[in-house]
Design a protein with these regions (language model features):
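Residues forming the flavin
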Residues: 2-5, 18-40, 50-51, 56, ...
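Short, solvent-exposed loop/edge segments of extracellular or virion-exposed proteins
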Residues: 8-10
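N-terminal intrinsically disordered, low-complexity segments enriched in P/E/S/T
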Residues: 13-15
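Short, conserved loop-to-beta-strand elements that form functional interface hotspots
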Residues: 45
Length: 558
């Protein structure tokens, strides 16, 4: 059996499994409201990866703890975090540390992000002879794709093939001599090549590498509808994190909606775990309408097609309803769950569920690259980092790969990681011998093949564009500051034609998520009103700290 750790939530005992997150433990016991906003509304886990800050709780008297990132490793006393509550006072007789007093490390190559791309970059550079240090915010390496199971016991489903592949990659990196530091948040990037980071125990450190590989991944892009801020509404990735790391279901009844293959994978996994999957609501039409693209996928990666068909088969044989050409148009509380209104093709349906998972693609986590001055272009949906074929950005010594640069999936990220790692090592003066040259050639071919797969995949999942003009005024645009679309539209109508001006007038983007969710929406509103396409200067300027950090840590008082 799993090791049970007693925790208290609002004075009530909650049995938790050792190693799982606080969010997983609370969710497993039907507790979905974690934070209380300034309007006395509840918020719960939304992103599941430390980005949204909606799951903030007080742990052992310390506020500002992200429930999804806080591990149950001992008995804990947890309370909801309430807006405006008094903060604990901490004093120190020592003066704040100056920048020169902070510990400095000068690795030859610094890799930020321990997902598939970052690990492959680190392995390749290390094999070429470079000294490599990898920093990652998560408690264990692997990233969002290879996140490992964090709990153990006879009652826990064992790791699957995807888990095992990730564990093997981490073992390969360590065997090669790569230094991996987990639980480290890189919250500052300064030109030309300086980084500030804080560990989970509060030590703040400066890193001055000769070169850097940025592989910070992406976070999910939901679509705003009335009620998307309610507890019980979360991203597809959040629900998948609950299952893949903690073997916890987000609820007994789960609806999954949006666009893309991750929703299908989640449905198959949760159904296999015992959930009642109410429906998979897909904005695109049936895959059967794109036989040519499906054939192109099979030619590019037969194994991934077989995997996708297996997910479809598990949903089909499990009786999971698949609703194509439909989208969520609103969510409202009903009893202990949610009532979700679906529209599409002139039809409307209302289904009840405990949890609604939303997944409409991804947004790159590119703040470090932007702060370093790397060039970005806007592809109509998101910023894309300019890179050459080896991952070199417009800034010398800065390499980037994976979903933080645009979107390409884990297989493309891994192949691009090998290319970037070898290029970085070569740029540092290390020789690339015949064996590594063959690896480089193979990685380039693999990257191209999987890009063809991705192109065909998104042809299959091509869906009608969601219109920002159709989002009702009473819908929340800024989840943190509780600003609605109507206020944003009014500010733009008053002549405020840039994101910074709207931010100052309405507080959109001033919350703890730092505009990660509202910025793309605001850019779309401004573009719609002005007729000007977004570019790399359209959003909010990236400013440190990019991650939550205490004033005590900033002062160097660990």
């Amino acid at each position: 059996m799993s090791e049970i750790v007693p925790i208290l939530f609002e004075g009530e005992p909650v049995p938790a499994r050792a190693g799982e997150s606080v969010a997983a433990a609370l969710t497993a016991h039907g507790i979905r409201g974690f934070r209380i906003t300034r309007t006395a509304a509840e918020r719960g886990m939304f992103c599941g990866m430390g980005v949204c800050q909606d799951c903030l709780v007080e742990v052992d008297g310390l506020p500002g703890r992200r429930a999804c990132m806080t591990v149950v490793d001992r008995p804990l006393t947890i309370r909801r975090q309430r807006h405006g509550q008094a903060l604990p006072t901490q004093t120190s007789e020592l003066p704040p540390a100056t920048i020169d007093e902070l510990e400095v490390e000068r690795p030859e190559l610094l890799v930020i992000g321990a997902g598939p791309g970052g690990l492959c970059a680190a392995i390749a550079a290390r094999r070429a002879g470079a000294e490599v240090v990898v920093l990652d915010e998560r408690r264990s390496p692997g990233g969002q794709y290879f996140k490992p199971v964090a709990v153990a016991g006879d009652d826990i489903q064992p790791p699957d093939a995807q888990h095992r592949e990730g564990l093997a990659l981490v073992a390969q990196a360590r065997a090669a001599g790569v230094v991996i530091r987990s639980g480290v948040s890189v919250w500052g990037a300064f030109r030309p090549l300086e980084f500030a980071a804080t560990s989970g125990t509060g030590e703040t450190q400066r890193y001055l590498p000769r070169a850097v590989v940025v592989a910070t991944g992406a976070y999910e892009r939901p679509w705003p509808v009335p009620g998307w801020e309610l507890p019980g509404v979360m991203t597809t990735g959040a629900a998948q994190t609950l299952w893949r790391t903690a073997r916890r279901l987000p609820g007994r009844r789960v609806m999954i909606a949006g666009n893309g293959p991750l929703n299908l994978q989640l449905a198959a996994e949760l159904h296999g775990g015992g959930a009642d999957v109410v429906a998979v609501v897909e904005a695109a039409g049936s895959p059967a309408r794109s036989p040519g693209a499906a054939a192109a996928m099979a030619l590019a990666s037969p194994a991934l097609v077989v995997q996708g068909l297996a997910y479809q088969w598990r949903c089909l044989t499990g009786g999971v309803p698949m609703l194509h050409n439909m989208v969520v148009s609103s969510v409202e509380p009903r009893g202990d769950g949610l009532a979700v209104t679906l529209t599409g093709g002139g039809a409307m349906r209302v289904l009840e569920t405990d949890v609604l998972c939303l997944g409409y693609g991804f947004e790159p986590s590119n703040e470090l690259l932007r702060a370093l001055g790397c060039r970005h272009d806007h592809d109509g949906m998101r910023l894309v980092t300019w890179r050459d074929a080896d991952g070199q950005t417009s800034v010398p010594g800065v390499y980037a790969l994976g979903d933080c640069t645009g979107l390409g999936g884990a297989r493309v990220a891994a192949a691009d990681g090998t290319l970037a790692g070898l290029a970085a090592a070569a740029g540092l003066g290390h020789a690339i011998g015949p064996e590594l040259a063959r690896d480089r050639k193979q990685a380039a071919a693999t990257a191209q093949r999987h890009r063809r797969f991705q192109q065909a995949l998104w042809t299959v999942y091509r869906a009608p564009a969601l219109a920002i003009a159709q989002v009702p005024d009473d819908t929340m645009i800024c989840r943190c500051e509780e600003v609605r679309f109507g206020a944003a539209r009014a500010a733009i109508a008053d002549g405020l034609a840039d994101a910074g001006s709207v931010k100052r007038a309405t507080r959109i983007g001033m919350g703890p998520c730092q505009g990660r969710y509202c910025r793309p929406l605001l850019e779309s509103l401004i573009s719609e009103a002005t007729g000007k396409a977004p570019d790399e200067l359209s959003g909010f300027a990236p400013r440190p700290p990019f991650r939550p950090v205490t004033i005590r840590d900033l002062a160097g008082k660990s």
